[in-house]
């Protein structure tokens, strides 16, 4: 399943976050949350996480960059389950790593879902409205 769309929710005082129904369908009841690039967290379905783990396992142990990548992704990963209200509990360590406060943006980006602190997300990506820059970026990427 490909995840798309942007949703805004609040993190409650216990660190629980409502997962939009559209995302729950593709995630299933059990999935993985880990750190991601850019200062956000990423959620992967069990199937997508297994595929990512297979790629990481295939990396050469003797390569220090490969070991660093494994530490970054696997060392912070946790398995999460939805509660009866469609929420997950994001561990304190992950909330701190992503600087999550109350207002959260969930962003479907293909094979995973990014979890952003809303202020950080809007500060970092407020310039997505610059069409000339987007056109140039798309062309450079071959899109």
Regions flagged by a language model, labelled:
Residues 1-9, 13, 23-80, 84, ...:
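Flexible "stalk/tail and boundary" regions
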């Amino acid at each position: 399943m490909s995840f798309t769309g942007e949703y805004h929710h609040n993190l409650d005082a216990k660190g629980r976050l409502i997962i939009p129904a559209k995302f729950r369908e593709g995630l299933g009841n059990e999935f993985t949350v880990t750190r991601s690039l850019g200062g956000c967290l990423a959620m992967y379905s069990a199937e997508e996480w297994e595929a990512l783990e297979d790629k990481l396992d295939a990396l050469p142990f003797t390569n220090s960059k490969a070991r660093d990548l494994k530490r970054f992704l696997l060392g912070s990963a946790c398995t999460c389950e939805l509660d009866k209200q469609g929420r997950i509990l994001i561990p304190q360590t992950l909330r701190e790593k992503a600087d999550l406060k109350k207002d959260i943006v969930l962003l479907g980006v293909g094979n995973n879902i990014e979890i952003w602190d809303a202020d950080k997300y809007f500060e970092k990506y407020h310039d997505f409205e610059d069409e000339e820059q987007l056109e140039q970026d798309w062309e450079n990427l071959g899109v």
